């Protein structure tokens, strides 16, 4: 066997030089409809030097796997001709050898598009090839993507269908550049997607070996990036074997592979030639890795000696079909003298020389090439040695060639008349046919819905492969058929190919600055993030409105619902204490109604209304502490605001009533506003605001902004309405503060201006502090309750001095003491009034006439002090000395 293989690849096994256009044809058979075929039957062109003449080079190094592919096309066409699919129509073929060279392939493409039945083999130039009749109607091939691209640009000029059986480059899916290109296999997009899927699920860090052309390089990069596959290194080998640096680059690649000791998985996206040389040298260096090999390389692996020493090889192969008839075809293969099949004759020649010694090998090949073998057996068929051919058959490619021939045949069946290639292309794109139990068709981008098989190259009973899974293109999943292959698939995923130990649950991978993009460190998940998987590179998401997670958590927790806090006990205690104070003040005032201190506080209704408002303010804080309900949510703010407003209004009325007696300007100013329209407008606005706050506000809501709890709280509704109520109360408080401040010089036992001023200052400070705080947070309501308590206690201060006098200084709570205070204040007040009267008299004397306004002001001033006396029950006219009364 080794001698036979040596004979197949020696330089003497070269094709004949091209003398005439017919010499370019490797195999041919006539028919009504001709199909072209492009196959790399020879590995390379013979000359490695720069060409000096525009002539087609000789080919060298006979390739058995590709030779078998040409036989697969011939067999498939014969199967169609022997069937009833194309009744009365015979398919013919012309197969060309591309020699793995673009120039030779272009020469074959030119012959395919040359004019039919033309003795000169010319390609006519036309602006419109709609009615042009070329030599062939369609082309099957080529194998290499680079060659298919070059050929497709020529065939696309006439929109001649080109169906490749092996070209998988994703670039060929571009229908703008390659409008007539189709393929009976899936594109690299799906193959690389399947590879990236397998690698990502296994968590491997990989190395990538590719060629420096379009084959898989760009698509693989896109898919690995999309699946977050970590690439430790990447090496690119020269695409063409004629490159003199290829051996050096292979050695450098293997050295890099050895240096990356922790990278145990290598993805190989190379051609058969590259894989054969790479693996052969890797076996010599005892490199043991996991090799993931693309579909182009799988047929080569079985031919590599001692390939099992290289480690595990996982191959992606084209999905296989029923090719049993082709096996029978090979077993009965023979050479007919009349056959126009140069590859078959070359195979027969090399088979005949397999027994020759090295010294006689050259002479044997020379004799065979002169046709002595054919003349010797011209009377009978020459049966070939075919016992080894099946081992070199790539079943997936054979099936792809069968599908290509079938697709063309079904498209021709739909036409069944004289047609042009572009008409065949239109039908071919939409053809659907059955092969076995499967239905096949072309996608819009030109690939067929075939898929891939994943095989593990391992020797079992003399065979070098075992199917592990099938890749489903549509659902992006691996389908495992039996338990044995499932175990193999599971064991494959257990292989370690990582730089670091995997991160535990509650951690994630974070990329570090290193020469490798895959280096990472394990970092603990921060608060409100979690990870329940090992070796993950991202945090898991959850609904942070309803759940939370601590630092380094492996799971998330549901937020607890809260509406009470231990601080509420303290606030309730302060509220109850305030209620007790109000009740105590009410009791004290009730028991001392007829004392001067109580009477000096104002009218009876005013006193009790103010105390009742304080009571409501303290009691209203309870609506903020209990569980939120619709009624409490809608009424609590309104209750507090109205209580404060009513309380401050009565205090303002009390202060303003006295102040008016001494200010004529204030009386004139208030006359402008003391009219029905302003009063009705203001009161109506207050009612509307309160109504909106009660009925238009949402009742109960949830505050989900806190990290670990959900606050069950009331929603305040319209901020504008709420602010309007607070603003109105603030305006009243400010007016009350001004009036109290202006009346601070009145008799102390009668006047409460100092304490009202103090209470209003506390009120302002508290609510001004509340504005920036009342925005957000768990303790927002706590702050509001504290502000309410502080401001309410501050206003209550106006009652504390009177209670102190009633309880502790009863000797000052007498009529005589109050009369004495009035008497001591009266000379000062009367003197001021007399001085004012004198000034008015002097002014009147110097003026031409008197002013009625000045006279009225003087009368008001005289009445002011009398009003003070009337407010006090103890102030009587008979108690005053006659001189002081007459002086006023």
Curated annotation (Swiss-Prot):
Glycan attachment points: 251, 322, 532, 544
Cellular component terms per the entry's GO annotation: plasma membrane
All ranges on the Cytoplasmic side of the membrane: 590-604, 663-676, 740-754, 801-888
Coiled-coil ranges per UniProt: none
Entry keyword annotation includes Transmembrane helix: yes
Swiss-Prot/TrEMBL GO biological process terms: regulation of testosterone biosynthetic process
Annotated TM spans: 569-589, 605-625, 642-662, 677-697, 719-739, 755-775, 780-800
Main subcellular location: membrane
Subunit structure comment from the entry: Homodimer; disulfide-linked.
Family the UniProt entry places it in: Belongs to the G-protein coupled receptor 3 family.
Role of this protein: Receptor activated by multiple ligands, including osteocalcin (BGLAP), basic amino acids, and various cations. Activated by amino acids with a preference for basic amino acids such as L-Lys, L-Arg and L-ornithine but also by small and polar amino acids. The L-alpha amino acids respond is augmented by divalent cations Ca(2+) and Mg(2+). Seems to act through a G(q)/G(11) and G(i)-coupled pathway.
Entry protein name: G-protein coupled receptor family C group 6 member A
Organism, as annotated: Bos taurus (Bovine)
Organism placement in taxonomy: Eukaryota, Metazoa, Chordata, Craniata, Vertebrata
Gene giving rise to this polypeptide: GPRC6A
């Amino acid at each position: 066997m080794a001698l036979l293989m040596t004979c197949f690849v020696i330089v003497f096994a070269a094709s004949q030089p091209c003398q005439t256009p017919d010499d370019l044809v490797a195999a041919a058979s006539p028919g009504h409809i001709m199909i072209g075929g492009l196959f790399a039957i020879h590995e390379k062109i013979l000359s490695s030097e720069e060409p000096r003449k525009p002539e087609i080079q000789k080919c060298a190094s006979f390739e058995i796997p590709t030779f078998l592919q040409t036989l697969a096309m011939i067999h498939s066409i014969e199967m169609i001709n022997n069937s009833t699919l194309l009744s009365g129509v015979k398919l013919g073929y012309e197969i060309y050898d591309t020699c793995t060279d673009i120039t030779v392939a272009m020469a074959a493409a030119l012959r395919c598009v040359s004019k039919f039945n033309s003795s000169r083999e010319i390609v006519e130039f036309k602006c419109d090839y709609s009615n042009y009749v070329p030599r062939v109607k369609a082309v099957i091939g080529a194998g290499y993507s680079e060659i298919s691209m070059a050929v497709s640009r020529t065939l696309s000029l006439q929109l001649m269908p080109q169906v490749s059986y092996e070209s998988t480059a994703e670039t060929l899916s571009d229908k703008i550049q390659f409008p007539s290109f189709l393929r009976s296999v899936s594109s690299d997009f799906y193959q690389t997607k399947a590879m990236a899927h397998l690698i990502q699920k296994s968590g491997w860090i990989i190395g990538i070996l590719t060629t420096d052309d379009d084959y898989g390089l760009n698509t693989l990069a896109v898919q690995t990036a999309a699946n977050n596959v970590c690439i430790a290194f990447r090496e690119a080998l020269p695409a063409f074997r004629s490159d003199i640096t290829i051996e050096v680059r292979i050695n450098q690649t293997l050295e890099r592979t050895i240096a990356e000791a922790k990278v145990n998985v290598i993805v190989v996206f190379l051609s058969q030639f590259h894989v054969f040389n790479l693996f052969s040298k890797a076996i010599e260096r005892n490199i043991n890795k996991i090799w993931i090999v693309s579909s182009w390389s799988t047929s080569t692996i079985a031919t590599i000696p001692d390939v099992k020493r290289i480690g595990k090889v996982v191959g992606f192969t084209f999905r296989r079909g029923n090719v049993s008839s082709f096996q029978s075809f090979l077993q009965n293969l023979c050479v007919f003298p009349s056959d126009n099949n140069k590859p078959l004759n070359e195979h027969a020649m090399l088979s005949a020389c397999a027994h020759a010694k090295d010294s006689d090998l050259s002479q044997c090949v020379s004799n065979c090439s002169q046709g002595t073998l054919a003349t010797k057996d011209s009377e009978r068929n020459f049966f070939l040695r075919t016992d080894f051919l099946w081992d070199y058959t790539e079943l997936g490619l054979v099936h792809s060639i069968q599908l290509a021939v079938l697709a063309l045949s079904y498209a021709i069946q739909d036409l069944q008349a004289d047609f042009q290639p572009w008409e065949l292309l239109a039908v071919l794109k939409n053809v659907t046919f059955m092969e076995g139990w499967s239905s096949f068709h072309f996608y819009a981008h030109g690939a067929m819905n075939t898929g891939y098989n994943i095989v593990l190259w391992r020797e079992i009973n003399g065979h070098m492969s075992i199917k592990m899974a099938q890749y489903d293109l549509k659902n992006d999943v691996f389908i495992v058929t039996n338990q044995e292959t499932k175990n193999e698939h599971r064991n494959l995923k257990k292989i370690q190919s990582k730089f670091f130990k995997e991160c535990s649950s509650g951690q994630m991978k974070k990329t570090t600055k290193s020469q490798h993009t895959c280096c990472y460190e394990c970092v603990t998940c921060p608060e409100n993030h979690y990870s329940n998987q090992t070796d993950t590179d991202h945090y898991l998401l959850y609904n942070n409105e309803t759940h939370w997670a601590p630092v380094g958590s492996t799971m998330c927790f549901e937020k607890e619902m809260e509406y009470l806090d231990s601080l509420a006990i303290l606030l309730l205690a302060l509220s109850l204490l305030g209620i007790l104070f109000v009740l105590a003040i009410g009791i004290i005032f009730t028991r001392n109604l007829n004392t001067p201190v109580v009477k000096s506080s104002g009218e009876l209704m005013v006193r009790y209304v103010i105390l009742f408002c304080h009571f409501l303010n303290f009691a209203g804080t309870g609506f903020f502490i209990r569980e939120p309900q619709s009624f409490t949510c809608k009424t609590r703010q309104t209750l507090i605001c109205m209580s404060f407003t009513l309380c401050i209004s009565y205090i303002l009325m009390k202060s303003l009533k006295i102040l008016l007696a001494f200010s004529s300007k204030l009386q004139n100013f208030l006359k402008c506003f003391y009219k029905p329209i302003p009063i009705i407008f203001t009161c109506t606005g207050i009612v509307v605001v309160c109504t909106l706050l009660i009925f238009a506000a949402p009742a109960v809501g949830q505050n989900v902004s806190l990290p670990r709890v959900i606050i069950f709280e009331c929603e305040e509704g319209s901020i504008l309405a709420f602010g309007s109520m607070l603003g109105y109360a603030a305006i009243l408080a400010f007016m009350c503060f001004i009036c109290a401040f202006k009346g601070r010089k009145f008799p102390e036992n009668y006047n409460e201006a100092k304490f009202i001023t103090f209470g209003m200052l506390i009120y302002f400070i508290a609510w001004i502090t509340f504005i920036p705080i009342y925005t957000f947070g768990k303790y927002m309501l706590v702050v509001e309750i504290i502000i309410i308590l502080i401001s309410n206690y501050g206003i209550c201060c106006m009652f504390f001095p009177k209670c102190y006098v009633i309880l502790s200084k009863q000797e000052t709570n007498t009529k005589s003491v109050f009369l004495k205070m009035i008497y001591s204040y009266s000379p000062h007040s009367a003197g001021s009034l007399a001085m004012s009267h004198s000034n008015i008299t002097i002014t009147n004397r110097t003026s031409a006439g008197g002013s009625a306004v000045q006279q009225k002001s003087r009368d008001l001033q005289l009445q002011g002090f009398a009003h003070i006396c009337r407010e006090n029950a103890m102030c009587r006219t008979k108690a005053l000395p006659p001189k002081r009364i007459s002086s006023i």
